[in-house]
Amino acid sequence: MSKYMILIHEREADYATMTPEGWQSVVDAHSAFTKAVADLGGTIVGGEALQQTTTATSIRSGEVTDGPFVESKEALAGFYIVEARDLDHALEIGKLTPAPFGGVEVRPVLDAPAAGGR
């Protein structure tokens, strides 16, 4: 099994006005996702939701600035690291990832021993 990162990009503004019931539906969707990954034969290795971009600090060329690097309607909201058989399997898992206000990006995690032979 190989590792893949599922990056969840969503519109923060939609979460700012969400009701408690809306939040519960998001939590329920992620719980169902966890079960679905196992049912597909994958494994969630880790993952977290991220705080709003207003809490981000960026460093570029040694210069520290508040906020993310670029202005965008969608921001990185969270991520999962999953183990999947191959990219097709990871994409199948990625399609199930809850992102009601955006979408996801699936990327292979670089295998450190293989890094020298990129």
Feature-to-residue mapping (PLM):
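Conserved, structured core segments of small domains
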Residues: 1-118
